[in-house]
UniProtKB/Swiss-Prot annotation:
Keywords, comma-separated and alphabetical: Metal-binding, Ribonucleoprotein, Ribosomal protein, RNA-binding, rRNA-binding, Zinc, Zinc-finger
Stretches with biased composition (Polar residues): 1-17
Region (Disordered): 1-26
Family indicated by similarity: Belongs to the eukaryotic ribosomal protein eL37 family.
PANTHER family from the UniProt entry: 60S RIBOSOMAL PROTEIN L37, RIBOSOMAL PROTEIN L37
Subunit composition and interactions: Part of the 50S ribosomal subunit. Interacts weakly with protein L4.
Protein name per UniProt: Large ribosomal subunit protein eL37
Cofactor annotation comment: Binds 1 zinc ion per subunit.
Gene that specifies this protein: rpl37e
Organism in which the protein naturally occurs: Haloarcula marismortui (strain ATCC 43049 / DSM 3752 / JCM 8966 / VKM B-1809)
Gene3D superfamilies per the UniProt record, alphabetical: 2.20.25.30
Length: 57
């Protein structure tokens, strides 16, 4: 039976996110080839949502 305890944490040594070419954030997923911050690799438009800012401001 495999658990998610201390021995399993030693397997987590691969780099998932690297620096994005467009926004510069460390959010570019190297396997998915998509930036989770700006949406680079998914869309030509910047990733932006209404819920990211306070409502009415």
């Amino acid at each position: 039976m495999t658990g998610a305890g201390t021995p399993s944490q030693g397997k987590k040594n691969t780099t998932t996110h690297t620096k994005c070419r467009r926004c510069g954030e460390k959010s570019y997923h190297t396997k998915k080839k998509v930036c989770s911050s700006c949406g680079f690799g998914k869309s030509a438009k910047r990733r932006d949502y209404e819920w990211q800012s306070k409502a009415g401001e």
